[in-house]
Amino acid sequence: MATGQNRTTVPENLKKHLAVSVRNIQWSYGIFWSVSASQSGVLEWGDGYYNGDIKTRKTIQASEIKADQLGLRRSEQLSELYESLSVAESSSSGVAAGSQVTRRASAAALSPEDLADTEWYYLVCMSFVFNIGEGMPGRTFANGEPIWLCNAHTADSKVFSRSLLAKSAAVKTVVCFPFLGGVVEIGTTEHITEDMNVIQCVKTSFLEAPDPYATILPARSDYHIDNVLDPQQILGDEIYAPMFSTEPFPTASPSRTTNGFDQEHEQVADDHDSFMTERITGGASQVQSWQLMDDELSNCVHQSLNSSDCVSQTFVEGAAGRVAYGARKSRVQRLGQIQEQQRNVKTLSFDPRNDDVHYQSVISTIFKTNHQLILGPQFRNCDKQSSFTRWKKSSSSSSGTATVTAPSQGMLKKIIFDVPRVHQKEKLMLDSPEARDETGNHAVLEKKRREKLNERFMTLRKIIPSINKIDKVSILDDTIEYLQELERRVQELESCRESTDTETRGTMTMKRKKPCDAGERTSANCANNETGNGKKVSVNNVGEAEPADTGFTGLTDNLRIGSFGNEVVIELRCAWREGVLLEIMDVISDLHLDSHSVQSSTGDGLLCLTVNCKHKGSKIATPGMIKEALQRVAWIC
């Protein structure tokens, strides 16, 4: 930033022109980077206007400030704050110096804690300087072409060295373009796509101001530009001298479009080499003024033809055959001259690490502290005067509590030191051998569980006969179908058993009431038609005679079947008739039973039969099936 004697060289109305331009386009800030009067070939802060968010408003006037003056007042307050901090930093230790710092600091209406993020960005920008050809303003000044940068907060630091600051302040769009012998930079917190009408609007705002060249252009000599090589001289380009036609230029004001202007322009166009010689030696100041005006007028009326998504450099052409630019030298020659010029000027490094050092030094200046947590290891041995006292651990801090003088400072100190320790402790716990062992145990247990599950599925696949696939879903589906089929078969067998039991009980009841067969009736009638008491029995009453009591109350007592593995034991008692034993044995054979022991006896018209047999073949008859088949044979009359 131009301080002290340098700042007086900036025109007074430049800030007002910046204010009008920035307010017209509604951007956050505007900066004019001018050629340094103390360092050759360097661009530094010339002036600026802040139009962004304001965190705290402080005024030293009793009356209300108008809306259009708020931005100017805020910009002045930020400049005063930076100057006060700079003076405090540069002052040496001592009573006299301390009183000077106190007086200077009291003049500032703002303090660092009153600033918003965007104001911090604007304030820190005051400390930046750029070599010509380096940094965004330096490249713009060297090339004479505007640069439009979108996504400045995420840009590479090699492209935009203040990307870290832009990220903290949410500055997304930054535009630089050459103007008035320096570089105008504008920025906003919104994402604005490339539009050359914005630059045109800013330039038009300067041109529409009341005779800006009367005050701005003559002040160019105050910048000591005569002692510094012009960007066009450094790059080896031809001077951007507009070649006007015989018609007067339509954009120029009437006071400028005179015959003298045409004569001076022709002199510049025809004798360009002599112009450069005069400019280097310090002569022909009026020609320089005309040259600068022609350059700015041509930049105002021409727009860009090329654009890109993020960073673009626009190239202007002649409009309608009225303006034509001189030829440029080759790029190789320009680069060689740049390197030669850089040997004569003080270089500033803009690699990311040096940018961090520069940023930390600015923060150190503002906060007046060199604490290791804030500045990092680069400033460990800094011995700078600070308003903060260095905190040291006392004897009580070893027990976990720090001795503090104020509750707020104690809370802040505890947050700064304890919170990182908590996170570090959690990280160490996650990285500890116990945690790794526990994680490994979980993996082993999960592997074993999956192996057991696979074994169960393979066992189930072997049990279910209809399973042909090996995937788990198919095995489960086939198992469900098989169980449903078994359930249906059980229901069918139970219903069949109930119907068989009902039928058997009905058959036994009928047999008890059934009369003797015809042979027995005939023999009974032939033998004796009288009963034991001498009474004659009617033939019609013979059918009503009760059968002999067998001593069995039901089928459960007449048939017993026992199964012992592959062996079956059948115990049967039924009414004896001719051929009944043979029929029973045939039924047992049909049931795939191999009889190896048969015991039978008859008495009182009953057949008692005990058969020991074994299953033969793959077909196995259940006890229910055996019982049902024997009941159909044994109780048929």
Curated annotation (Swiss-Prot):
Residues 497-521 are annotated as: Disordered. The keyword Kinase does not apply. SMART domains: HLH. The keyword Disulfide bond does not apply. Induction: By nitrogen deficiency and UV light. Negatively regulated by MYB66/WER, GL3 and BHLH2 in the developing non-hair cells, and positively regulated by CPC and TRY in the developing hair cells. Mostly expressed in roots and flowers. Also present in stems and leaves, and, to a lower extent, in hypocotyls. Expressed in epidermal root hair cells (trichoblasts) and moves to root hairless cells (atrichoblasts) by a cell-to-cell movement through plasmodesmata (at protein level). One of its GO terms (cellular component) is nucleus. It is found in: Nucleus. This is Transcription factor GLABRA 3. It comes from Arabidopsis thaliana.
